[in-house]
Structure formats: C-alpha cells, structure tokens
C-alpha cells in the first residue's frame, strides 16, 4: 500500500490510546466510506497458550475500531474457526462477529462479516503468517523439511482436510462488499476439500521441488475437516488448486 495514492500509519488497535492516536492522524470530521478491519492475531495453536492476547486484540481491538472511526460501511475479516469455536482464536473471532453485528444494526450502519477459509496463494510477496500452509511449504523448499502436524485424523489419508481459497479471490469479495454490503455473515470458500498431504504433493509438482516430510503430533485447536457447505455469492472461483500452490518470484 505504500505509494503515491495511499497513506500508511502503524497503530495498535488494542492500545487504550488508540482512539486518541487515530484521531491525531485522521483529524477531519468526514465519514469514511468503508472500513475494512483485517487486524487480528490468527494462530490457532498459539491462541491455546496465550488466550488473553487473542481476546484483547480480536475482541477489544475490534470494539476500539468500531467505536472510534466514523464510517458508512464496515467489513470484518473473520474465520471459519469461528463456527466451531474449538480454540480461543475461534471464540475471540466469534465474539468479534457478534460485536460488529449488534453495533452496526443498532447504529444503522451497513456491514459485512466474511469468514475466510484457508487463504493461500502468492503474488511475489513473502507470506505474513509464518505458520500458514503456504509459508510452511516455501520454508520447507528452502530448508529441506516440512513439518506435518497430525496424520492420524479420521480422513482419507490421515491429515487434515481444508477448503482452500486464493488471496486474490478474497480481495475480489472485499471489493464487492464495498460496493454492495451484505448486512450479514458470509462464508468465503469453495466447498472443495483437499488434504494437507495432497497439498504437499501439489506444491512439489507445480514448483518442481522436493523436501522431506516429518510428522509431528496434532496441534491443539486444529479441526479435522473444515470444508464450506454454503457458498457465498461474493465468492468467485478464479484459481485451480495447482494455481493456489504456485510460488511466484
């Protein structure tokens, strides 16, 4: 976003001084057309060890953003983990969903809540989530070993099954929600399940690389199967599973 058309500021949404800090940056009184709230802590496993951090950022931080800025349309990035609420991460995001829904309805503000499902894909930028599948595969390609967490699940090959989406598909959905708010929760997935073991082999094939796979115990909070059943009209399938795993750059 750093360029002639954008201004970028670094703020802590959970800081008690956030309302003061952000008003110092945005000193004008006009409303924003849309706020897209993407800031969050997202590591499922880590949330089981540091739940307070996740509730502070994902719940209190969301409340700060909601109540500090003026806007006509609010978009919340949530997660499929909010459905099962099997981890502090999932619970914190579900709480954020409810806060956004109730606040926007009370204030008569347009809103959309998007639950993302396993976003992957690359456009030449290093993945920001070091524990995500794509980042882990890129690291394995460089270092020689991929760590597979759990291979004893009740699935076709023992590894977790997920519904994968491309980051550009998610961006397209966000743009649609700017233009036409849903005023409800929408799930962003394709309803197609692919196992982690299958994704490993696809990554090796499309990127012409090889590495070892070392099995580790399953991580706390990981769902065995997470595949979407109800497909949102905001979601358009634009990439094949091979394209999802293609490393650019």
Spans of model-derived segments:
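NAD(P)-dependent short-chain dehydrogenase/reductase
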Residues: 88, 101-176, 200-204
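Mid/C-terminal beta-alpha module of Rossmann-like enzyme folds, strongest
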Residues: 140, 173-218
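N-terminal Rossmann-like NAD(P)+-binding domain of SDR-like oxidoreductases, especially those catalyzing
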Residues: 1-122
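Conserved C-terminal active-site "lid" loop/helix of NAD(P)H-dependent oxidoreductases
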Residues: 167, 216-243
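Generic structural signal for residues in well-ordered beta-strands
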Residues: 8, 111, 146, 211-213
